[in-house]
Amino acid sequence: MRETLYFKDDDSRLSFLQGNYVTLTNMSDHDIDRICRYHLSPINISFQTMNPDLRCKMLNNRFAGEALKKVDILNEAGIRMNGQIVLCKGVNDGKELEFSIQKLMEYLPNVESVSVVPVGLSKYRDGLYPLEPFNAQDAGEVIDLIEKYQKICMEKYGTHFIQASDEWYILAGREVPEEERYDGYLQLENGVGMIRLLLDEFHDGLERRITEKQSGAGLPWEGIREISLATGKLAFPYLKRMSEEVMQEYPGPVSYTHLRAHETCADL
């Protein structure tokens, strides 16, 4: 067979090589032994919940709860792990989320970080579990709970450990945290800290450009430049804000900024 056909989406090798998240349900004892023997880490794990019964229900797999015992083996072997919890309203949020956070803290420092991300919903859900989207109030409650445990983890372990993805802050109408709260952006590819990193890199670049312009060291920005930015709905306010900041520094020949947020399939 083709080489790529030897890999499944839930294959631990993809987690090590490409950062994929695995549920552990498809991992045999041989797979776990191989990870421990060769010390393949970090391994990214989709926990969803630390409640075994609820995990079986969420993953529609009667072995999903039992699979959590594999985390104990990996932890004892010193395997570094990162985790994610895909949050579903009325299912694994609230008290269940708090329970999961508390249980995952027991695996520090080998579990280095855990991100909490909202479940992605589309209109194509015929025959699927009737999930509801989170609203602004829900997002605020999720953030408050996460930030509560960030303070606890920082005081006890010197790390914020549990992270809220950018969507929560945008949905709640809150500013994203400062860079220090992301612990080196361990969950960047999972949508945690992307907005903060973008803002900080943008402002660093803009300040450098302004300094060059004032000193005459940089190349002059002459003529009219038309720039198109393609973005989704969630990131649109930030792109608009940054474009307006550029316009304040270069109001000359370019007299306006026009951005439009187009609908996408994911509605993001």
Language model regions located:
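Structural motif
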Residues: 166, 229-235
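Conserved small/polar residues in nucleotide/adenosyl-binding loops
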Residues: 257-264
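Short, solvent-exposed amphipathic alpha-helical segments in soluble enzyme
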Residues: 61, 242-251
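Conserved Radical SAM active-site core
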Residues: 1-110, 121-149
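Hydrophobic beta-strand segments of well-ordered beta-sheets in folded domains
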Residues: 43, 224-229, 253-255
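Hard-cation-handling environments
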Residues: 143-225
